[in-house]
Amino acid sequence: MTIAAENLTANHPRRKWTDYFTFCVDHKVIGIQYLVTSFLFFFIGGSFAEAMRTELATPSPDFVQPEMYNQLMTLHGTIMIFLWIVPAGAAFANYLIPLMVGTEDMAFPRLNAVAFWLTPPGGILLISSFFVGAPQAGWTSYPPLSLLSGKWGEELWILSLLLVGTSSILGAINFVTTILKMRIKDMDLHSMPLFCWAMLATSSLILLSTPVLASALILLSFDLIAGTSFFNPVGGGDPVVYQHLFWFYSHPAVYIMILPFFGVISEVIPVHARKPIFGYRAIAYSSLAISFLGLIVWAHHMFTSGTPGWLRMFFMATTMLIAVPTGIKIFSWCGTLWGGKIQLNSAMLFAFGFLSSFMIGGLTGVMVASVPFDIHVHDTYFVVGHFHYVLFGGSAFALFSGVYHWFPKMTGRMVNEPLGRLHFILTFIGMNLTFMPMHELGLMGMNRRIALYDVEFQPLNVLSTIGAYVLAASTIPFVINVFWSLFKGEKAARNPWRALTLEWQTASPPIIENFEEEPVLWCGPYDFGIDTELMDDEETVQTLIADAAGS
């Protein structure tokens, strides 16, 4: 049900389309720039995945040669992590945080623009490595393998990640400062939206872990270019040191990729279930707990790397412990759904897809956290299936949920719901068909990252490839929906979902200054069910806001 609210944008100047191609400091423009750029890289990285799955439909190299397969595999992983999911989280944070806390812009607008404009050059550098021999050592780039493949392709990979990592650090500084220092006067930490809590936890992880990755990459670059031996065993270096440095960032990176979308789900579910969030403080504090525990679990990636037994036990325990705050979130979301007036629109369908898929990824995560089990499935397709259920079934489903939820606010247009539902159905079927067989392949002993495999693995690989084609097809209704809705969609009201957070108090899309006057907290961000009949009347809502401002 929509509310016929005045579209304030009509009375104010709007951003021109050319602003989205310039060094604009408006956080909303930067948020859209991040979102569009991340999806462009999603299509590039996804096309690499389709090429890989086409090759894996047969045991022998029929479609691409093993060297090209290794390059595609390396760039696919790097793009999907560093140029799709991470920037997509930054897109929502840039667009929403100032609106949610009731301020005009980020704390450091120019720094915010610099952060974005480091990302496209990073992506261009990475893809241009094809012209000099793309890296073949995987997205982890372990030495000595990374020291033996194409030197200049590997160097471009390093420079790309340094640019994107710098972008993440600059963005995190902005997010933390804006959340802590620029909230409106009536908003304390426990009355701000849970998305802001999620970004506070994410930004803390970025600031603590990304410099460690940068140091590892710089040392690896010296080994490549200057002939040093920090990680080269031929000269007395230790490759395991690189693994520790790399995973000290790259396991927290999993939470950097999922925590923003935990925040998205915490916004979507109460709005479309018409019910207060269950356990606000539990969800908020569990984000901080995940952020802390995420820094002390990295060596579970190294159970087979000569890690001492006592250290294995420590990291197994901390890895299993991190399931506790994650489980708190799952139970809180399910508690919010229980007894709610659920609206099965596109945003909510993807939220349901997130819940079911992420729980599968979480359960398999507890399995691989166990040392005896991990030793047997390490570097097999079981691990590939696990992390794709976490990152695609988790982050990507929540990303699409957020796109459908905030599309009216960002564009001033409603999405086409039948196309959105078709997008969800194809994505859900394709995702499970692609990644579920990988668990069985891993248990059967199929190694990851290799183009050649035994013929006994072919039936499940064919099934997985069919699923990948369904996933590719699922993007068609999504793209059609976005462009059709932009130009032909029904005009959106200021608050079509009858939500309570501050971004819905301004026009759709928001005016350049965000708000005509300082917004007012007239209720909590999730006070659904309290005089809910009032929410059906926009005039009554505005009266309540005015009364709150007067008091």
Swiss-Prot record:
An annotated GO cellular component: plasma membrane
Binding site for Fe(II)-heme a: H76, H388
InterPro entries listed in its UniProt record: Cyt_c_oxase-like_su1_dom, Cyt_c_oxase-like_su1_sf, Cyt_C_Oxase_1, Cyt_c_Oxase_su1_BS, Cyt_c_oxidase_su1_bac
Enzyme class: translocase
Catalysed reaction, written as an equation: 4 Fe(II)-[cytochrome c] + O2 + 8 H(+)(in) = 4 Fe(III)-[cytochrome c] + 2 H2O + 4 H(+)(out)
Cofactor binding: number and manner: Binds 1 copper B ion per subunit. Binds 2 heme groups per subunit.
Entry binding sites for heme a3: H386
Pfam family, one: COX1
Binding site for Cu cation: H251, Y255, H300, H301
UniProt KW keywords: Cell membrane, Copper, Electron transport, Heme, Iron, Membrane, Metal-binding, Respiratory chain, Translocase, Transmembrane, Transmembrane helix, Transport
Cofactors demanded by this protein: Cu(2+); heme
Purpose: Cytochrome c oxidase is the component of the respiratory chain that catalyzes the reduction of oxygen to water. Subunits 1-3 form the functional core of the enzyme complex. CO I is the catalytic subunit of the enzyme. Electrons originating in cytochrome c are transferred via the copper A center of subunit 2 and heme A of subunit 1 to the bimetallic center formed by heme A3 and copper B.
Protein name: Cytochrome c oxidase subunit 1
Designated gene of the protein: ctaD
